[in-house]
Amino acid sequence: MSYPPNQGYPPQSNSPQPGQYGAPQQGYPPQQGYPPQQGYPPQQGYPPQQGYPPQQGYPPQQGYPPQQGYPPQQGYPPQQGYPPQQGYPPQQGYPPQQGYPPQQGYPPQQGYPPQQGYPPQGYPPQQGYPPVGVPVGVPVGFAPGMVVGYHQGYFVGTITHDCKHDAEVLRKAMKGIGTNESDLIKVLANRNWAEREQIKREFSAKYSKDLIQDIKSETSGNFEKCLVALLTEPAHFDVEQIHSACAGAGTNENTIIEILVTRSNVQMEYIKQIFKNKHGKSLKDRLESEASGDFKKLLEKLTEPRDESPVINPMQVSKDAEDLYKAGEGKIGTDEKEFIKILTSRSLPHIAAVASEYIKHHKKHSLIKAIDSEFSGSIKTGLIAIVTYALNPYGYFAEILNKSMKGAGTNDNKLIRTVVTQMHNMPQIKTAYSTLFKNSLAHDIQADCSGDFKKLLLDIIS
């Protein structure tokens, strides 16, 4: 399914703006106030923001950089200053979509028993990703002031390939009669976003042509959609996905939920800025026109900053678990506002700890089951998505991919969106997929897709 906060948070600095590295595009205020993300050693003992009671069948989680650097949201006291608590599992791992380098100095929290039905997993730290913001020299093609590895809060990697040569290969693949689709796949599926952005620049500088427009004129169908997605800035891509989900008859609530639930405060702030500049209407206003009732309130809250501290306050966890019980299963009727308030404002590690606390003390079943019995429709889908993502983010994305290919036909837009936006997390997502479902992700793509589109997807996930 990656935001500078709305209030009290200074805009980012050293992060490239829409359109250009280091130079703000008209309409986007320059980011200020964040120092370059350099020199942070990997977090020791307290892996990035997760490790809450894992769900059954989910593979060991591999860490996402922690969502750090923001004070707790208004109305909630800072969750700081608590000594290491006995009774919580080691917290680790949200995908490096979150835009923060790993932090150091949090002792491990141990001993929290897993939710009933969920085996303990103690997710190890993230493996296989380059260190965030610790470049050995500045890669070719990066403008001064760019935070290497991140753009608008999204993980984009660093430039290690010869992007000028890649631009030449792409031009040759589309020049003349016919198109060499294999070369398009070979280059674009095997470069990170920072490299693909630089390839676009090199292509434009050398040939005075727009690479995306050339791709559109030379390809078609899902193959074209996926290539264009690979070449679109991450925040802009999210904006267009949300806008498309709201367009036409009906609203694709699942697309909106999958994006809003999984994006950080930094990412969400850019999504809101870009949406307003591009579509002349605030994201909040657009969502209000597409939804109603409690679901509308949930979407509004999901666009606001949530606490991103990795520190858990056990007393607040116990109180929230009790409050959720009293708001749902412990009374006649349901207090929807209480569920929305807690699940949209608390940190993801906190929510996972609440889910574990809930199962210990209330009805001996999960918070997800409680939500399922108390809610219906889109509000139920949204609340369950929050808890599921908090408990196991890689498993959450694996489930989205599986649903996109399950049953008759394939939801190509969902498949493209998830594969492209989570390609840097694919090793862990593929492991989760193989554990949760009968087949591997590659096997199911092979069975459900065809032609150059299938080849492109298989190259991306490999």
Curated annotation (Swiss-Prot):
Q: Where are the Annexin repeats?
A: 161-232, 233-304, 315-388, 392-462
Q: Oxidoreductase: is it a keyword of this entry?
A: no
Task: Cite the InterPro entries for this sequence.
Answer: Annexin (IPR001464), Annexin_repeat (IPR018502), Annexin_repeat_CS (IPR018252), Annexin_sf (IPR037104)
Q: Which SUPFAM superfamilies match?
A: Annexin
Q: Which domain of life is it from?
A: Eukaryota
Q: Does the keyword Repeat apply?
A: yes
GO terms for biological process, alphabetical = intracellular calcium ion homeostasis; plasma membrane repair; response to bacterium; response to wounding; sorocarp development
Annotated keywords: Annexin, Calcium, Calcium/phospholipid-binding, Repeat
Q: Region Disordered: what ranges?
A: 1-130
| Gene Ontology cellular component terms for the protein in this record | cytoplasm; endosome membrane; nucleus; phagocytic vesicle; plasma membrane; vesicle membrane
- Stretch list, region 19 X 6 AA tandem repeats of Q-G-Y-P-P-Q: 7-131
Protein function: Calcium/phospholipid-binding protein which promotes membrane fusion and is involved in exocytosis.
Q: What is this protein called?
A: Annexin A7
Q: Which gene encodes it?
A: nxnA
